[in-house]
Design a protein with these regions (language model features):
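Structured binding/interaction patches within domain cores
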Residues: 1-203
Length: 203
């Protein structure tokens, strides 16, 4: 039943609360990073760009969270960003504090606008898939599939997702959720995508 509840839920705050025990902090941090990336105008302010890059390194264990201590309070970040604390600015805080990504993500989502909440819902599904329907990707980890997944992860260019679907089918994948996710032309893919992560063995 919980899997169906996840599929129906439209409130990102409720999706966050539904995440099972032991969920991936790495994935949650990538969710936050992508939310910030989508809401801050480009080019990012220098502070935002620096913090965002650091947060992504922390997510993949390429940096230590202590390296982000130079921004430590909500008030300081609000002053740095120069705007109110809705949506993207709240999420930027999550990146800088980093000690409890789950609590800080809740704090931020509670302050998101309705449109930001809708986008957060979409991103949570892109990154976590349906965490109550576990899929074993091991049988489909051919050299071709893994190479495609790794290339997209490293480059952030997910244009090869339909090609990945073909490679997965060649490897024997007949899971409609996986194949449809790869081939959906309306789906925006980001680093942390549940299919790409599954193939790369990332949690």
């Amino acid at each position: 039943m919980i899997a169906e509840t996840w599929e129906r839920e439209e409130d990102a705050r409720e999706l966050l609360r539904l995440l099972p025990n032991g969920f991936s902090r790495r994935k949650l941090r990538h969710f936050v990073c992508e939310f910030v990336r989508s809401h801050f105008p480009l080019p990012l302010r220098i502070e935002a760009a620096t913090v965002l890059a650091l947060a992504e390194q922390i997510a993949d264990d390429e940096a230590n969270v202590d390296e982000g201590d130079w921004v430590v309070t909500y008030e300081e970040l609000d002053e740095r960003a120069g705007t109110s604390f809705a949506g993207g600015n709240a999420f930027l805080l999550v990146l800088t504090i980093g000690f409890d990504i789950y609590d800080d993500a809740h704090w931020a989502l509670d302050r998101a606008t309705s449109s930001e909440n809708e986008q957060a819902n979409t991103l949570l599904r892109e990154i976590f898939g349906n965490p109550f329907r576990l899929i074993d990707f091991a049988p489909w980890r051919t050299d071709t599939a893994v190479s495609l997944a790794r290339g997209m992860y490293d480059s952030r260019d997910f244009g090869a997702m339909p090609i990945l679907a073909d490679a997965l089918q060649d490897a024997g994948c007949d899971n409609e959720d996986v194949l449809n996710h790869c081939r959906d032309a309306k789906q925006t893919h980001v680093r942390g995508c549940w299919v790409v992560d599954g193939l790369l063995g990332l949690v």
